[in-house]
């Protein structure tokens, strides 16, 4: 029952999944989504449904709904029907059709009333109103929707349509889904309207009651047409904003042909010497395609070719036609070519259709960002895909392949174009699949038979010629042996087809190399047929053989038809003969180059924008003015070019050869770019593009100053209803509560005030920049104000002042005032404030703007103080510095900064007020003395009067006491009575208390005083009455309490509560009494705590700082566990830096990677220890060595066992070869992806990589026994001679078999039972690593042209530039040669190679990267690298396989010659751009080249020398047009950057600001005759920094680094990784074994050979003679692949199933996969025999062919490496 229920449940789940993934459900879902795409058609639909009434209204509703549904149905049909989709999806459809229709509808119905159309039944047919409603809803439904864009849904449809099989069902279901959603939406709208009408509360609350309600409703209904017209107008405006206008859009100019043909005039001169076309090495190779297109248009009857989708063959076949017309005259041919080109341009412009003229699909209609590439000027378009889709036959069926070879498709298309009679008829898929399978079966059987016959012949010991399959040739006549030439035979491979020579890097190509190699490229004759250079002659030749085009079509189809038919007719022989006659070459297999210049490979044109754009900033900079078009196309930030200094004087210390340069400008200008202060709304937008379509820029304010992205909306100051933030309010309250400090409030207030001032200043600057003629007006006003101030206002004030002094009989101060007036300087500045001079105006100062800076401004003073007094006072009093400069405003005021607020000028009358205040103080001091005298006299007089009064008062008091002795009053009794009354709680009034207090007071003060008897009697009576009342009240209360029902328990509660209240009352009184002392104690403790905390702040901060720095350093050391951090310090540092240095030095001792140490080194150190007892190490060694027994050699284990350190016992190994072995062959076949560690580090995380290294990296000498076994196992087999065919082979044949045998050994290793580490040919690993490291063949973009290192090591930098090399340059003005003399000095200071403890050992490899060395003295550029080590340079402790790099390579560049003179010749025409693409060409080797190939070591020194010279030459020439070197430091820095290309130099940020400030002062000081005063004042103000003033003319690179001026930073290069690399590295994780990172003794010599032989990767392979024979070698390689694929196409299924845990695929195999038994290793001899006999069905190198042939992987869904079939691993008994 349970099984049945689970079965039902599983079926239900699967059924639900099928329903969800079905086409119908997906279509319904998509259709329901399209309901929310609301467009203008809904306006008409709602209008018809809401407003129209009556019979006509019903008809309109029906017509509107019908048109709406019909329009949507057309949209869905357009998904399936391609022509309709293209018509509706064009970008110009809406512009041409939708906008005029919208505008017509708006203006036509705008003046009409909604209900007054005047329609009757008679004119119904004439007006066609119902039909118009239908058309409106139909047409508007076809327009793009704007509330929810339909582009997203269209992409979903396209994706699903590509995957869907039943496309019509999908379209139908999506339409039904839309219809359901539309009905639901309309019903919802109707329900909402009905609810609004029926709900009285909404109408009563929202609308006005009484008669006004009806009036408003009628007005709303009458104005409904106007409302809809307004909505339509808004829609039109919206579309106008989103659609590019064809008329007003700026048309960008395409690149001119003269610019495309070459980079410079010199290159064009070189190219025109050979032909009227550009040379092969022109700068813009892709620009030649336009010439090709024009030529092809001419040949193909001017048919239009799409430049983005068409493949071309690069050729210049019109050169022959032109030269024939002009009898070979080259000059006339040039003229003729240009004439033809001009004619073609005019004709092409006329023939362009209207759509392409109005709508340029290559124009930047959308605001895309222009990404400029220095190598390829034109930007690549985004439409380029990395995949190529085409239909192909796979598994006998037509399928769409995303990885179809594009060259095959192009070749087939070219044949169809060039030979119109050729067409292929499509056969039905069923017939083709059956035919395909039958053909494969037949081929397989034939190959089986042939293979068996050859094996039988092998058993019969026939000769090798009859056994082995011979090479297949493309033959015309077998009897005559007429073959296709070897160089063009497609069946041949290798050297017979010619060697593909990869040219030298383009940066080292010289002019002589170009002249020697132009015209040496051969032409592919088969391409020549397809190109049909002389098309008419080609057609006539075809007609000679047969005029029937149908026969030609039938016979030529044999090249491509999969059916096998024999060609026996005469026509077929004629066709083949014709082909061979055309293609046949001369006897020397060389092509005459008089007719053609060159033909390149077939290529796919990358779609690029046809414009070379530059920004406004590049135009302002003025660089490369000749090679850049005039008008800028990129709108950069608003800026202006300001010349701040013009150097007209020649300098002798600069290169003198610059005088002879024609391009040298004698007036060297220093230019600054001035940016506008306003917000950058352009953001490098391209002219002509639509700014409203821009992403990430939204304007939500009416007047928005700055551009913001919506992502930062929460960071921007918002409106009140957006800015209610509870969290922010709580923070503000807490901050104000905690920090009630007046000083901080003042600081914040001052900061806010300064921010407001800066904002206002920028707003004023924006206003001046925004208006058209504002700068002209402002500049003229400033100059006028300057003249008025200097020459009119100030002299007039001086005259008035001195004349008034003369009238007041005072001495005039003419000389002092005139001296101050002359000291004032009006310096003309640029708009940014760069000072020029008093008389020199900046260029274009009227339009660009100007600033006038007043130095030492003149202020009128009423009098001048004496010099001695003022100077002495200034020395004694150090007041704050006063700014002795200001900027002039338009209104003649003074301001501190340009466009700042006017500052208050010192008043003329201020000294008067100061003097008046001083005199008033003097008068006050004198008057105070008089007042003090009178005050003292008043005090004495008052004291005497007081004493007399007191004496009289005492006398009177004594007399009264005597009189009142006889009549005393009993005050104490009264006091007692009233104290008793106070205890009563039921007293009603407070009068007795008051009287008692009054009596008490009197009795206390006047004890002896006598009262009248009447008053005493009254008091006694009152007391008695009150006492009686109290007694009466108490009696009444007792009666009440006795008569009540209260329990004694409640009375006790009341009494207890009273007691508690009394206790609380006492406590309160006590607290009130003691609160003062408590508060005082708290304040004292708080102040004490604050003082202690303030005293502990330095200790806590220093402790926290050291802890944080320690954590940062620990983190950096952990991240770089494989490297040793070399952190260098400056000398004479502060104490803080020295403490950090100690911390680093302590940490560096523990930062080495233990995995990188060798076993020999570790155990050698252990053996040197003077310790006899290893008890402490025994546990560690037993655990580590026993746990990692696979990675410790047997010799070391035996050594420890003999010495009794521990007893080691072999454990059972647990590695699973069943998962590893199927991948080994594939990994070894892709050895080129075994990249260096620095590239591998980019694919995995650092922590994960460290774990893998700790588990898998092995020590250097781990497998000597296994290595010896691997070395000799095939030599042992050679002696056995198990196969008799071995003896039949000749020595030459054995040599040929050796190549395949080296590759075959990897396949057989997978069958070996011995569990061993992953092994690869060591030459391949080392050669791949070293050659890619030092020839630039890495996979990092744009670095391939440099011959650089993998990283920059700090110890090498001072070796090249600081200590050991001095670069000196001399200039020869006549020959224009630069001699750079490089002299190696202090070579004995090279760091020691041998280490302590290892000095007696001889080893080729040494610790050249400074392991176990503590470096503390090397300079560091900036301390920020200390705290952020991730930005530090690559460290130098065993970074990239240091055990592979020998001493010879380390000292390769500078150890051969100590004095090396490089002569670099500068030629005008020798510059070759670095962005030229590589191309392939065929050639035949000469004897000299063959000799160099045989002995590459002979050619190596010359090659190295040429590379170095040409490399430096190209780098210097590349910068020749941009800048000229003026000092040795520039040459040194450029040389540094060229050698270490993956690093860049930058200077400090603060230094940049200081240098700019210094430049501004320099510009003024240079123009002054006596600059001392200005210089001193600028230094005092802090405008000019003395620390960056360079006293030396040529600072070395080391000094710049030490001063912190230059900082080295590594470049973050982008990596291009292909799919195979990632797959290789992913699979290789499980196969990282010790042998991958080790070098045995047998391979040391081969490592040296692989290092020196840089051109060939695998010249010296292993010297083992693998002369074993396998049956597979009988067949040729091509037939071998075919045989494997045919055998594996139908594998027999067996019962054994193997689950691959790595990819989770169920695989059917032919038997047990790699049985894991340790007893299989007993009989290794028989296993080796079996290994040589067995051979795999196919190799992994044929994986691509197998995928397309059988595994059906063209769509990429069924790709799996584990489908590979393996033979059974048999068990051999001894």
Curated annotation (Swiss-Prot):
* Membrane disposition: Multi-pass membrane protein
For bias type Basic and acidic residues, the affected ranges are 254-268
- Keywords for this protein: Chloroplast, Membrane, Plastid, Plastid inner membrane, Protein transport, Transmembrane, Transmembrane helix, Transport
Fetch the InterPro entries from UniProt: TIC214 (IPR008896)
UniProt-annotated location(s): Plastid, Chloroplast inner membrane
Top-level lineage group? Eukaryota
Q: State where it is primarily located.
A: plastid
Q: What else is known?
A: There is a partial copy of the N-terminus (positions 1-364) of ycf1 in the inverted repeat (BAF49817).
User: PANTHER family this protein is in?
Assistant: PROTEIN TIC 214 (PTHR33163:SF40), PROTEIN TIC 214-RELATED (PTHR33163)
Protein task: Involved in protein precursor import into chloroplasts. May be part of an intermediate translocation complex acting as a protein-conducting channel at the inner envelope.
What protein name does the entry list?
Protein TIC 214
């Amino acid at each position: 029952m349970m099984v049945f229920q689970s079965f039902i449940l599983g079926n239900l789940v699967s059924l639900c999944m099928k329903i969800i993934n079905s086409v119908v459900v997906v279509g319904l879902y998509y259709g329901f989504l399209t309901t929310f795409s609301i467009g203008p058609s809904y306006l008409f639909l709602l209008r018809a449904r809401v407003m129209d009434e009556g019979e006509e209204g019903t008809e309109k509703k029906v017509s509107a709904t019908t048109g709406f549904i019909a329009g949507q149905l057309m949209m869905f049909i357009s998904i399936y029907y391609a022509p309709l989709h293209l018509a509706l999806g064009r970008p110009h459809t809406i512009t041409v059709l939708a906008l005029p229709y919208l505008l017509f509808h708006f203006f036509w119905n705008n003046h009409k009333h909604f209900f007054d159309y005047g329609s009757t039944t008679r004119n119904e047919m004439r007006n066609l109103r119902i039909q118009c409603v239908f058309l409106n809803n139909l047409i508007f439904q076809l327009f793009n929707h704007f509330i929810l864009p339909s582009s997203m849904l269209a992409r979903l449809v396209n994706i699903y349509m590509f995957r869907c099989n039943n496309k019509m069902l999908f379209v139908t279901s999506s339409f039904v889904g839309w219809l359901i959603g539309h009905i639901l939406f309309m019903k919802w709208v109707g329900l909402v309207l009905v609810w609004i009408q029926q709900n009285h509360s909404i109408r009563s609350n929202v609308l006005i009651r009484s008669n006004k309600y009806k009036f408003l409703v009628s007005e709303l209904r009458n104005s409904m047409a106007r409302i809809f017209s307004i909505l339509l107008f808004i829609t039109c405006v919206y579309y106008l904003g989103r659609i590019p206008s064809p008329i007003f859009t700026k048309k960008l100019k395409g690149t001119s042909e003269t610019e495309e043909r070459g980079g410079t005039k010199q290159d064009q001169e070189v190219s025109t010497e050979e032909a009227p076309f550009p040379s092969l090495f022109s700068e813009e190779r892709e620009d030649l395609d336009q010439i090709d297109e024009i030529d092809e248009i001419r040949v193909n009857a001017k048919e239009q070719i799409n430049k983005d989708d068409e493949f071309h063959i690069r050729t210049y076949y019109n050169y022959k036609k032109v030269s024939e017309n002009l009898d070979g005259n080259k000059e006339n041919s040039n003229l003729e070519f240009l004439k033809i080109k001009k004619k073609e341009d005019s004709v092409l412009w006329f023939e362009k259709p209207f759509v392409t003229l109005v709508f340029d699909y290559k124009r930047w209609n959308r605001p895309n960002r222009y990404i400029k590439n220095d190598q390829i000027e034109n930007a690549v378009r985004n439409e380029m895909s990395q995949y190529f889709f085409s239909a192909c036959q796979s598994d006998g069926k037509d399928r769409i392949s995303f990885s179809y070879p594009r060259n095959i498709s192009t070749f087939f298309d070219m044949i169809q174009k060039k030979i119109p009679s050729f067409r292929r008829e499509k056969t039905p898929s069923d017939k083709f699949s059956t035919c395909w399978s039958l053909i494969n079966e037949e081929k397989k059987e034939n190959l089986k038979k042939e293979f068996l016959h050859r094996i039988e012949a092998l058993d019969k010991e026939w000769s090798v010629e009859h056994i082995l399959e011979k090479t297949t040739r493309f033959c015309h006549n077998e009897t005559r042996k007429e073959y296709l030439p070897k160089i063009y035979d497609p069946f041949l491979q290798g050297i017979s087809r010619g060697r593909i020579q990869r040219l030298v890097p383009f940066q080292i190509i010289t002019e002589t190399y170009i002249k020697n190699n132009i015209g040496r490229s051969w032409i592919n004759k088969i391409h020549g047929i397809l190109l049909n250079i002389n098309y008419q002659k080609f057609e006539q030749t075809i007609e000679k053989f047969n005029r029937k085009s149908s026969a030609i079509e039938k016979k030529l189809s044999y090249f491509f038809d999969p059916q096998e038919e024999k060609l026996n007719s005469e026509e077929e022989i004629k066709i083949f003969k014709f082909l061979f006659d055309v293609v046949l070459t001369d006897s020397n297999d060389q092509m005459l180059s008089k007719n053609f210049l060159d033909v390149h490979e077939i290529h796919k044109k990358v779609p690029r924008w046809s414009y070379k754009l530059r920004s406004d900033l590049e135009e302002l900079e003025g660089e490369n003015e000749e090679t850049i078009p005039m008008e800028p196309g990129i709108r950069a930030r608003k800026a202006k070019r300001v010349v701040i200094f013009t150097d007209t004087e020649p300098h002798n210390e600069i290169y003198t050869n610059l005088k002879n340069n024609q391009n040298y400008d004698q007036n060297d200008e220093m230019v600054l770019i001035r940016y506008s202060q306003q917000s950058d709304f352009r953001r490098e937008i391209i002219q002509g593009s639509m700014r409203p379509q821009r992403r990430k820029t939204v304007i939500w304010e009416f007047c928005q100053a700055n551009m913001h992205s919506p992502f930062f909306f929460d960071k921007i100051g918002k409106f009140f209803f957006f800015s209610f933030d509870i969290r922010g309010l709580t923070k503000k309250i807490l901050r104000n509560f905690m920090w009630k400090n007046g000083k901080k409030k003042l600081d914040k207030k001052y900061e806010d005030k300064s921010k407001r001032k800066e904002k206002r200043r920028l707003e004023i600057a924006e206003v001046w920049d925004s208006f058209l003629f504002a700068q002209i007006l402002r500049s003229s006003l400033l100059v006028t104000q300057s003249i008025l101030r200097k020459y009119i206002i100030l002299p007039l004030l001086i005259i008035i002042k001195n004349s008034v002094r003369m009238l007041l009989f005072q001495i005039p101060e003419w000389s002092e005032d005139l001296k101050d007036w002359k000291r004032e300087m009006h310096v003309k500045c640029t708009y940014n404030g760069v000072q020029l001079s008093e008389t020199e105006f900046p260029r274009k100062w009227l339009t660009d703007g100007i600033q006038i800076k007043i130095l030492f401004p003149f202020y009128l003073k009423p009098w001048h103080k004496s010099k001695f007094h003022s100077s002495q006072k200034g020395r004694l009093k150090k007041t704050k510095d006063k700014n002795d400069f200001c900027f002039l405003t338009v209104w003649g005021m003074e301001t501190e900064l340009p466009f700042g607020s006017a500052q208050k000028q010192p008043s003329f009358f201020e000294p008067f007020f100061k003097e008046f205040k001083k005199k008033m103080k003097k008068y006050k001091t004198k008057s105070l003395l008089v007042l003090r005298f009178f005050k003292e006299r008043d005090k004495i007089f008052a004291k005497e009067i007081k004493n007399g009064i007191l004496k009289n008062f005492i006398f009177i008091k004594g007399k009264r006491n005597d009189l009142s002795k006889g009549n005393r009053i009993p005050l104490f009794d009264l006091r007692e009575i009233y104290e008793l009354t106070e205890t009563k709680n039921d007293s009603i009034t407070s009068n007795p208390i008051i009287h008692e207090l009054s009596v008490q007071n009197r009795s206390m003060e006047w004890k002896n005083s006598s009262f009248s008897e009447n008053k005493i009697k009254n008091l006694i009576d009152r007391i008695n009455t009150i006492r009686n009342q109290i007694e009466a009240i108490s009696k009444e209360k007792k009666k009440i309490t006795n008569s009540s029902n209260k329990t004694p328990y409640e009375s006790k509660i009341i009494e207890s509560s009273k007691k508690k209240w009394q206790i609380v009352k006492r406590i309160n009184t006590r607290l009130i009494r003691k609160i003062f002392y408590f508060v005082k104690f708290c304040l004292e403790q708080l102040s004490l705590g604050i003082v202690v905390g303030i005293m502990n702040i330095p200790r806590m901060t220093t402790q926290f700082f050291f802890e944080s720095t320690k954590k940062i350093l620990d983190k950096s050391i952990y991240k770089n566990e494989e490297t040793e951090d070399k952190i260098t310090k400056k000398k004479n540092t502060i104490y803080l830096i020295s403490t950090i240095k100690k911390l680093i030095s302590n940490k560096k001792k523990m930062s080495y990677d233990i995995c990188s140490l060798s076993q020999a080194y570790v155990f050698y150190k252990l053996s040197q220890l003077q310790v006899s007892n290893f008890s402490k190490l025994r546990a560690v060694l037993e655990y580590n060595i026993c746990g990692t027994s696979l990675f410790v050699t047997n010799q070391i284990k035996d050594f420890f066992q003999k010495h009794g350190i521990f007893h080691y016992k072999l454990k059972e190994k647990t590695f699973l070869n069943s998962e590893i072995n199927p991948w080994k062959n594939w990994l070894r076949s892709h050895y080129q992806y075994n990249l260096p560690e620095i590239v591998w580090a980019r694919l995995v995380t650092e922590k994960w990589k460290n774990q893998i290294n700790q588990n898998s990296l092995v020590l250097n000498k781990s497998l000597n026994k296994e290595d010896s076994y691997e070395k000799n196992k095939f030599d042992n087999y050679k002696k056995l001679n198990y196969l008799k065919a071995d003896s039949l082979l000749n020595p030459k044949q054995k040599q040929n078999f050796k190549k395949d045998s080296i590759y075959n050994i990897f396949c057989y290793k997978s069958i070996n039972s011995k569990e061993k580490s992953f092994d690869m040919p060591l030459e391949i690993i080392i050669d791949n690593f070293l050659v890619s490291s030092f020839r630039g063949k890495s996979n990092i973009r744009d670095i391939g042209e440099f011959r650089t290192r993998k990283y920059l090591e700090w110890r090498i930098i001072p070796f090249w530039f600081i200590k050991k090399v001095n670069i000196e340059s001399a200039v020869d003005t006549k020959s224009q040669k630069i001699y750079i003399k490089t002299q190696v000095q202090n070579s004995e200071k090279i760091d020691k190679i041998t280490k302590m403890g290892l000095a007696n050992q001889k080893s080729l490899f040494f610790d050249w990267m400074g392991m176990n060395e503590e470096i503390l003295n090397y300079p560091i550029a900036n301390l920020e690298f200390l705290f952020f080590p991730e930005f530090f340079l690559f460290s130098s402790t065993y970074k990239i396989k240091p055990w592979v790099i020998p001493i010879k390579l380390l000292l390769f560049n500078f150890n051969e010659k100590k004095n090396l003179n490089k002569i670099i010749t500068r030629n005008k025409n020798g510059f070759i751009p670095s962005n030229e693409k590589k191309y392939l060409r065929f050639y035949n080797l000469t004897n000299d080249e063959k000799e160099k190939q045989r002995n590459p070591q002979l050619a190596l020194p010359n090659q190295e020398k040429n590379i170095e010279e040409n490399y430096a030459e190209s780098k210097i020439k590349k910068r020749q047009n941009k800048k000229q070197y003026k000092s040795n430091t520039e040459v040194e820095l450029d040389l540094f950057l060229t050698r270490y290309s993956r690093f860049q130099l930058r200077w400090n940020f603060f230094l940049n600001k200081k240098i700019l400030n210094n430049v501004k002062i320099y510009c003024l000081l240079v123009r002054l005759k006596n600059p001392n005063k200005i210089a001193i004042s600028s230094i005092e103000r802090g405008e000019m920094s003395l620390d960056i003033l360079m006293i030396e003319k040529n600072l070395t690179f080391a000094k710049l680094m030490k001063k912190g001026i230059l900082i080295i930073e590594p470049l973050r290069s982008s990596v291009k990784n292909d799919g195979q690399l990632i797959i290789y590295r992913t699979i290789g994780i499980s196969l990282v074994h010790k042998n991958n990172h080790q070098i045995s003794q047998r391979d040391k010599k081969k490592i040296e050979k692989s290092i020196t032989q840089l051109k060939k990767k695998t010249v010296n392979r292993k010297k083992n003679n693998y002369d074993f024979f396998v049956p597979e070698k009988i067949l040729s390689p091509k037939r071998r692949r075919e045989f494997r694929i045919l055998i594996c196409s139908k594998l027999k299924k067996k019962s054994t199933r193997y689950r691959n845990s790595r990819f989770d695929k169920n695989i059917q195999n032919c038997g047990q996969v790699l049985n894991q038994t340790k007893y299989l290793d007993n009989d290794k001899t028989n296993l080796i025999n079996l290994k040589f006999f067995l051979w795999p069905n196919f190799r992994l190198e044929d994986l691509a062919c197998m995928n397309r042939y059988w595994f059906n992987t063209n769509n990429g869904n069924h790709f799996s490496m584990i489908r590979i079939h393996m033979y059974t691993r048999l068990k051999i008994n001894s």
